[in-house]
Amino acid sequence: MSVKQISIFLENKPGKMCEMTEVLAANKINMRALSLAETEGFGIVRIIVDDVYDATTVLKDAGYINKLTSVVVVELPDVPGGLNRILKVFAEDQINLDYMYALSAETSRDKA
């Protein structure tokens, strides 16, 4: 399955991530997944949200540079070696992974 991901560029300073997530929270946008990569001067926050259009709009209106891309979602069995089985398929097909989200979900959908 493919979903849209938003990449947001942030200054690498205390509180900047809090400010960005406040914009999303104030607009009732729920993050489903998050990944953060940082360098000395800036960070790239990659998020998957419940409302991509509204999220990109409110982020842009708040002054955040963001980019929308498609990512592949793979559900893995929750067993030892589950991830390895999928990675073998990628390796055999010469598919390179740039980054990945990892999420272990409980049966309850209302818990993060």
Describe each PLM feature range.
Residues 1-80, 84-112:
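Structural preference for solvent-exposed beta-strand-turn elements
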